[in-house]
Regions:
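Conserved ABC ATPase signature
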Residues: 174-177, 181-236, 246-259
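C-terminal lobe/lid and adjacent interdomain/linker elements of RecA-like ASCE P-loop ATPase modules
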Residues: 260-337
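Catalytic acidic motif of RecA-like/P-loop NTPases
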Residues: 5, 23, 250-251, 256, ...
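Pre-Walker A-like glycine/lysine-rich segment at the N-terminus of P-loop NTPase domains
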Residues: 1-54
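Walker B beta-strand of ABC/ABC-like P-loop ATPase nucleotide-binding domains
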Residues: 8, 244-246
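Electropositive, glycine-dotted interaction segments
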Residues: 64-185, 191-194
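Phosphate-binding P-loop
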Residues: 1-2, 236-239
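Short beta-strand segments that buttress and anchor functional surface loops
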Residues: 57-63, 207
Length: 337
């Protein structure tokens, strides 16, 4: 995968499955695999076309010379970690060391052996798939968060957005002001967030309008605006995670907000964050190079992913945007609706 990876493809092509793999990998690392599988349909749903067709899941992820490999099999209605290994590439040779065999959960989190395990641990702990789609009256954005316990990193569903923004406000005001200005660029009426911790050090997301003295809550934003606020906080935070994974971040966003979103994604990537995003938006696609875009298609029941190449599209890109080429089926990747 590259630094920026924009996945395009039709519904059912496998984009969401691919993103969910990283979510699954994080649960494996956190030793929450059994719980995650049980809450998401059980073992059979995770096998390609069910356990009658597939009897093993194997994955290998690698960063430069370091590798992590895991193999899962079914045992008594649940997954068993059949093999778990660390790998190291030296030229054309790859050397593996066992971490665990036939255990209920992965062992990489507690691994204290080879130094490459520390490197892989640092990477796996920061793999998060973010979901900011729920914006209703009981959404994660409406929850109280603790200004001490919930300040360290943004949670996957934005539950601690208030406490995380408060921490940025207190510790890195320059970054905080940048986030506020970006929000104002798509919501001119927005003045600032209103931070008023309770005696118990909890906080709700509140804000003020430029034209009123009232204090508002998250449900007073439009769906698109509260999503944009979460996205701006995610991508512009002082130290973004090593990997940001998100499915259809453009949902509910105005074209101007989508343009801002693309810019924020590039900012995070420039700081070393790897971006993996699935989209159906031609507006978003227009802001990326062909080499940053991967087409996803289902071929004979399997997902096929192909990265675009500028040389193949230069003639077309003189007159059309990448989004136009996708609409016109010149870029093959499940045409946008």
């Amino acid at each position: 995968m590259g630094q920026i990876n924009i996945l395009i493809g039709s519904n059912g092509s496998g984009k969401s499955n691919f993103l969910s793999f990283f979510e699954f990998l994080n649960k494996i690392y956190e030793q929450k695999m059994t719980e995650y599988v049980a809450l998401n349909g059980g073992v059979d749903k995770f096998f390609h076309k069910g356990s009658k067709v597939t009897d093993v899941i194997q994955a290998e992820v690698f960063w430069k010379t370091n590798r992590y490999q895991i193999q899962l099999k079914e045992g008594d209605g649940r997954f068993v970690v059949a093999h778990e290994k660390l790998g190291y590439a030296a030229g054309s040779m790859i050397y593996y060391n066992d971490i665990a065999n036939y255990t209920n959960e992965a062992g990489i989190k507690q691994y204290k052996g080879l130094k490459r395990g520390d490197y892989i641990n640092n990477y796996l702990t920061e793999i998060k798939k973010y979901h900011f789609h729920d914006t209703g009256k009981t959404s994660p954005f409406t929850k109280e968060s603790h200004i001490q316990n919930d300040r360290y990193y943004l949670y996957e569903k934005g539950d601690n957005l208030a406490a995380f923004l408060y921490a940025i406000h207190e510790e890195t005001p320059i970054v905080y002001n940048r986030i506020v200005k970006v929000i104002q660029s798509i919501a001119p009426y927005f003045s600032d967030f209103y931070f008023h911790p309770t005696a118990a050090n909890t906080l709700r997301l509140q804000w003020r309008d430029k034209y009123s003295s009232m204090v508002y809550g998250p449900t007073d934003f439009s769906d698109g605006t509260i999503r944009f606020i979460a996205l701006a906080t995610l991508f512009l935070q002082p130290t973004p995670p090593k990997v940001i994974i998100i499915d259809e971040p453009e949902l509910g966003l105005h074209p101007v907000a989508i343009q801002k979103l693309a810019g924020m994604m590039h900012v995070a990537a420039s700081k070393g964050t790897q971006i993996i995003v699935a989209t159906q938006s031609t507006d978003l696609l227009c802001h990326f190079k062909p080499e940053e875009v991967i087409t996803v298609n289902q071929v004979e029941g399997a997902t096929q992913m192909v990265r675009l190449n500028s040389e193949d599209l230069n003639h077309w890109l003189e007159d059309y945007t990448l989004g136009d080429l996708w609409k016109q089926n010149i870029v093959k990747g499940g045409q946008p609706e």
